[in-house]
């Protein structure tokens, strides 16, 4: 890790890992301050299907969402995802990367990482997003 990596926030570091692991996808980083609640990433998979990913980094079980983020995912439950990187200690052989469907944001806000993810680990997440239609 160079100078930049040392000074990147945890979400920026996670985004770099996502970029590395999702090389076959087109990733568009949405830096959107005008529309609150807009997800972090617009993703186009190899079949030309789009989805969005909200990037979250969590030190504990809880995942924090703004009311705008919750509203966005309730309004757009399909092909929206929340990708979480757990920074805290995890059981052995557990991936630290989790993918959740946007339609489950209310449960995710309530239960945090206790909620079952639809995919764990970069490879499983990539396959899940590859098979969108």
Predicted regions and their residues:
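Acidic-basic catalytic patches of nuclease active cores, encompassing PD-(D/E)XK
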Residues: 2-32, 46
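Membrane-topology and secretion signals of cell-surface/extracellular proteins
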Residues: 10-15, 25-26, 67-70, 113, ...
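Beta-rich catalytic cores
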Residues: 37
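Conserved catalytic cores of phosphodiester-cleaving nucleases, focusing on short active-site segments
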Residues: 41-43, 49-59
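Mg2+/Mn2+-dependent nuclease catalytic core
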Residues: 58-76
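Sequence/structural signature of beta-propeller domains
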Residues: 63, 102-107
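Nucleic-acid nuclease catalytic cores
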Residues: 74-104
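Charged phosphate-binding loop/patch that engages nucleotide di/tri-phosphates or the phosphate backbone
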Residues: 110-133
